[in-house]
Regions:
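Generic hydrophobic alpha-helical scaffold/packing signal
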Residues: 9-16, 120-123, 164
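Carbohydrate-binding surface patches
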Residues: 143-169
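A glycine-rich phosphate-binding loop feature that marks nucleotide/adenosyl-phosphate handling sites
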Residues: 26-34, 112-116, 139-147
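Glycan-recognition surfaces
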Residues: 2-109
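Catalytic cores of secreted or luminal carbohydrate-active enzymes
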Residues: 91-140
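Short amphipathic alpha-helical patches
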Residues: 38-39, 50, 120-121, 142-153
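A broadly tuned, weak detector of single residues within folded domains
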Residues: 17, 90, 119, 156-157
Length: 169
């Protein structure tokens, strides 16, 4: 397995050198099994095939124990999760993705005009705040209520913070 892994790293390095305008993403192999050594060879890792925004909150909370948030692929998925059948607003799906490598995984040709406008607003917000989100100190807050997750980013100089409070159950 070691030789296969080293060969994979060499392949990624060659692809990055040959195609510098492409961002390469590693797979989590079903979630929770990111090869931490691959970070040196890719721009991000796909965190999990579970794209349900509420489920991703917990997955992402613990994955950032080992991988910096900006390296974790996190996308706004379709309104109704294929895995759980739960439906979420654009705001919740976007708020779940913005702390990480923000993207869109949703057939927006099927989105309403209102959802498209809200999505556009989130994209503008993310672009304006990306440097702060990816250069600050990521924090996980311990909350006594097991149905609540809280995490956020604090600017390096302490001048600013953004905290997410998630009602998990």
């Amino acid at each position: 397995i070691h030789n296969q892994t080293v060969a994979y790293y060499r392949l990624l390095d060659k692809l990055r050198a040959d195609f510098p305008d492409i961002e390469w993403e590693s797979c989590a192999s079903g979630g929770g099994r990111i090869d931490t050594g691959v970070i040196e060879h890719v721009q991000r890792c796909w965190t999990s095939d579970m794209t349900d925004a509420l489920s991703r909150q917990c997955i992402q909370r613990w994955t950032v124990q080992n991988i910096a948030p900006e390296y974790l692929g996190a996308h706004i998925s379709q309104p109704t999760s294929q895995q759980t059948g739960r439906t979420y607003s654009v705001a919740f799906r976007a708020a779940t993705a913005v702390f990480h490598s923000f993207g869109i995984e949703w057939d927006i040709t099927k989105a309403s005009d209102a959802d498209l406008q809200e999505l556009a607003s989130w994209i503008v917000w993310y672009k304006a705040n990306r440097d702060f989100l990816h250069s600050g100190r990521f924090v996980r807050l311990d909350v006594a209520d097991p149905a609540v997750l809280a995490h956020g980013v604090v600017a390096a100089d302490g001048s600013r913070a953004l905290i997410a409070h998630v009602q998990y159950e």
